């Protein structure tokens, strides 16, 4: 009869063996090949969640620890993290880690070279690379049902871009529609192909919390499947993450803050475009690529399990679709293809969300032209009236003046730092203001 060999990390008599914590910690790290980066365990398969680690520890030590297994597992996990601490690695842009190995670039810079060798990584895609995977017919039909053909090219390239840990495109994809088209199914499919540990599913509003940034550390994709109509009170974090090339301070609950270099990309689905309450800058607008889903065909019958069926049967084919998009993007030097229709829609939506630009383009109470002048306070009163009439949220005074200088530049409007006199129906007043624009007294009188 074969004799049972006790674990190396135990000691004592056969009937009363005990746990050697120091040896167990070392053996756990060795067996699971884990490293601790910013208090998170990672293995060659990517993120190694604390819950999974504690369950493995409890299963191991249960025969050798009489009580308080949860507390003991918590203590051991803390020691494991301390012992296998490592500095964050530089994101790898020359390889992709898939379930069955590693993809690297060929002589043309395309991800076509496959090896079954696995390396330590922060982001492993939980789908096998199979160059002979059949065409994902369900997935392609879903795309045809929901998106225009030329928009599918943009989608393929942007979604493929999410495989790489980089923010080089400096764009967030905002997909909008009237509701019921099935646009957010794409988010569920991407979450399944990229992997739960590589995606963060939440509302963008979470980024306004002090601990919001820490949630996207080492994530490939942020998915908001129900974009709120409420504007962001502070858009700075969103802008920084979309274009990030440096380290950012991340606050975490109950642990020390640390510096992270996030590379998360954003895909948001909703009935509204993304708006910022106090940021109408070109930078905020430029970071958004706005795409509109096709209206739902009246006779289309939806399959409520389509995302599950695609992931169960076509995940390898969808991965090839993503790789094709990424490789095309690389060939185009990371210049994403955008249809004229979508580009025009993006520009239109951006203007609709820009109250200052709308004021300059649409307000009947102002004139724009050479030789005209207006005081800043008068312009702001006219702007407030325009926003009230059009149910827009006006900016604060200083923000309005800053945006007026920026938005008015192309229209010949210039701020003047020296006070000047103006004669109006209210009398003569001396104050600072702008050249190239004037306000009709009657417009203000009517609105008072």
Regions found by a protein language model. Give the residues of each.
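Short, small/acidic-rich helices and loops at N termini and domain boundaries
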Residues: 1-4, 40-68
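Feature primarily recognizes SF3-like P-loop helicase cores of small DNA viruses
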Residues: 1-37, 63-181, 185-448
């Amino acid at each position: 009869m074969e004799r049972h060999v006790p674990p190396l990390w135990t000691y004592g008599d056969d009937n009363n063996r005990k746990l050697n914590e120091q040896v167990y910690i070392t053996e756990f790290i060795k067996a699971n090949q884990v490293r601790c980066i910013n208090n998170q365990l990672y293995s060659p398969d990517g993120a190694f969640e604390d819950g999974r680690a504690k369950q493995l520890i409890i299963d191991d030590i249960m025969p050798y620890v009489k009580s308080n297994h949860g507390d003991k597992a918590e203590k051991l996990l803390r020691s494991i993290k301390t012992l296998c601490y490592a500095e964050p690695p530089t994101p790898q842009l020359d390889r992709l880690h898939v379930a069955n190995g590693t993809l690297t670039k060929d002589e043309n810079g395309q991800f076509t070279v496959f090896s079954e060798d696995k390396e330590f990584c922060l982001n492993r895609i939980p789908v096998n690379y199979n160059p002979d995977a059949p065409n994902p017919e369900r997935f392609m039909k879903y795309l045809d049902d929901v998106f225009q053909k030329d928009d599918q090219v943009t989608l393929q390239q942007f979604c493929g871009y999410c495989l790489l840990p980089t923010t080089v495109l400096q764009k967030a994809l905002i997909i909008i529609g009237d509701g019921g088209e099935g646009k957010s199914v794409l988010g569920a499919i991407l979450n399944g192909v990229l992997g739960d540990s590589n995606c963060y599913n939440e509302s963008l509003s979470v980024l306004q919390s002090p601990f919001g940034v820490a949630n996207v550390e080492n994530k490939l994709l942020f998915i908001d499947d129900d974009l709120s109509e409420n504007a962001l009170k502070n858009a700075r974090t969103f802008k920084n993450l979309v274009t990030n090339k440096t380290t950012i301070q991340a606050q975490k609950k109950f642990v020390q803050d640390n510096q992270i270099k996030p590379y998360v990309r954003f895909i948001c689905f909703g009935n509204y475009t993304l708006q910022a309450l106090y940021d109408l800058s070109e930078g905020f607008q430029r970071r958004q690529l706005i795409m509109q889903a096709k209206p739902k065909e009246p006779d289309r019958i939806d399959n409520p399990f389509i995302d599950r069926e695609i992931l169960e049967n076509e995940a390898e084919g969808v991965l090839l679709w993503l790789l094709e998009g990424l490789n095309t993007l690389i060939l185009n030097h990371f210049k994403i293809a955008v249809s004229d229709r979508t580009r025009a829609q993006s520009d239109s939506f951006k203007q609709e969300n820009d109250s200052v630009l709308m004021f300059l383009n649409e307000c009947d109470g102002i004139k724009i032209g050479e030789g005209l002048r207006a005081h800043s306070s008068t312009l702001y009163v006219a702007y407030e009236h325009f926003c009230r009439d059009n149910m827009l949220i006006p900016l604060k005074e200083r923000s309005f003046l800053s945006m007026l200088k920026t938005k008015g530049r192309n229209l010949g409007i210039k701020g003047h730092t020296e006070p000047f006199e103006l004669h109006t129906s209210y009398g003569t007043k001396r104050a600072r203001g702008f050249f190239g624009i004037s306000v009709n007294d009657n417009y203000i009188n009517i609105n008072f």
